[in-house]
Amino acid sequence: MEYMAESIEHSPGHILCCECGVPISPNPANICVACLRSKVDISQGVPKQVSISFCKQCQRYFQPPASWVQCALESRELLALCLKKIKAPLSKVRLVDAGFVWTEPHSKRLKVKLTIQKEVMNGAILQQVFVVDYVVQSQMCGDCHRVEAKDFWKAVIQVRQKTLHKKTFYYLEQLILKYGMHQNTLRIKEIHDGLDFYYSSKQHAQKMVEFLQGIVPCRYKASQRLISQDIHSNTYNYKSTFSVEIVPICKDNVVCLSPKLAQSLGNMSQICICIRVTSAIHLIDPNTLQVADIDGNTFWSHPFNSLCHPKQLEEFIVIECSTVRDLKRSAGAGVISKKHTLGEVWIQKTSEMNTDKQYFCRTHLGHLLNPGDLVLGFDLANCNLNDEYVNKMNSDRVPDVVLIKKSYDRTKRQRRRNWKLKELARDRENMDTDDERQYQDFLEDLEEDEAIRKHVNIYRDATIPVESDTDDEGAPRISLAEMLEDLHISQDATGEEGASMMS
């Protein structure tokens, strides 16, 4: 006879809950989950309703103790901000999960679902899920409050240039737009001889001053004025002013250098033409094609002025033009321009066509001029030059005429211009009636000088048909490859509504 061993199944033991008597698996507390939750609330101390401040003007949330941050709805940044509001109570429990519960954007409510754990009776760990309701309260931030009170700026940059032309400011405006340096400005104000930039902090203004020093030759002075002070906390409220002065030289200006400066630049002639102003002043000697760059420090050490202003430009017609092939260079001469050709021309004023008076001069435009072409220049022979360096020069070394650039039909150039520029949104006051002509001069400079326009964002104007890079007269134009597509421009920047064109 064989005995069969009975299979014994081991099942976990059960105990009765000490509160309600329900059979449960053994646990350190000897109590069921329902009774444990009724006796212990691990979320006690965590507020179920919290207020959070929101500025409607700038769309920012208040982050204690004194900062305002930009956060999108249901973003990680906003979730972190909400959790910081209950950071102290949450430090007593273990946060397992957190997330937003969807609410209507206009409801002024933010709901955050939290999952927490905490050790309770005899080492038992209890997990609980609950929702914290955040009430969004409107509160104006300090920056917006100062804007509404017309006391919004903490620092201002006053950019000035003592010239009759604004070419440098137009170039400066395009660089500011390209590199986004206008984003921290509260207000930009245009006056007759410059621009004012207003900032909410001194640090933003200092960053702008450093940017200006890197793109144009300039110098600045800083000052500050005490607005208020608190003797109890020893805090002071200042308004800072940065006065930035740009060198008073623009493109196409004729200048006379001091003998010492001309000698230090490679014995170049004192009478030079400014062909470009970027981070330095680029000069060319029309008699030898010698070029030199003068930075801001050199200019302020050896200052010089423009001999003529743009309104004194006169139109000449080319009678005869020849290229100078063999140019003798003296010892110690500087760099010669490879982009220009030295030429000798006979010219006559278009206003004196009924006379036989002609002028002879050398020019750096030998590669552009042909008999019959029109060219713009300054008549130094019949001009009253009030300059200390010119007065000390030998009259034989002062040219009768200095040619600046070839003249084209401006009306045709404007009609065929298939590109546009953006402009800064700014307040204007006391605008000169000559501003439009000066702006057209700047646009023509961009077409003629590739070195300048490579730093400028140029946008294609879809309303103008695409043509060749040069027109019938040979006037330079900007190629389509150099233009950008702009989907935000709705007005032409060269028109009256150009001030609002900023994306």
UniProtKB/Swiss-Prot annotation:
Q: Does the keyword Protein transport apply?
A: yes
Q: Report the subcellular localization.
A: Cytoplasm; Nucleus
What does UniProt give as GO cellular component? cytoplasm; nucleolus; nucleoplasm; nucleus
Biological process GO terms, please? positive regulation of protein localization to nucleolus; positive regulation of RNA biosynthetic process; protein transport; ribosomal large subunit export from nucleus
Pfam families xrefs: NMD3, NMD3_OB, NMD_SH3
N-acetylmethionine is found on: M1
Nuclear and nucleolar localization signal, short sequence motif: residues: 405-422
| Residue positions where Phosphothreonine is found in the record | T433, T470
Keyword terms, alphabetized: Acetylation, Cytoplasm, Nucleus, Phosphoprotein, Protein transport, Transport
The short motif Nuclear export signal is annotated over 480-489
Molecular-function GO terms, alphabetical: protein-macromolecule adaptor activity; ribosomal large subunit binding
Query: Which family does the UniProt entry place this protein in?
Result: Belongs to the NMD3 family.
Give a short account of what the protein does: Acts as an adapter for the XPO1/CRM1-mediated export of the 60S ribosomal subunit.
| UniProt-listed PANTHER family | 60S RIBOSOMAL EXPORT PROTEIN NMD3, NONSENSE-MEDIATED MRNA DECAY PROTEIN 3
Question: What assembly does the database describe for this protein?
Answer: Found in a 60S ribosomal subunit export complex with RAN and XPO1. Interacts with XPO1. Associates with pre-60S ribosomal particles.
Could you identify this protein by its name? 60S ribosomal export protein NMD3
Protein's organism? Mus musculus (Mouse)
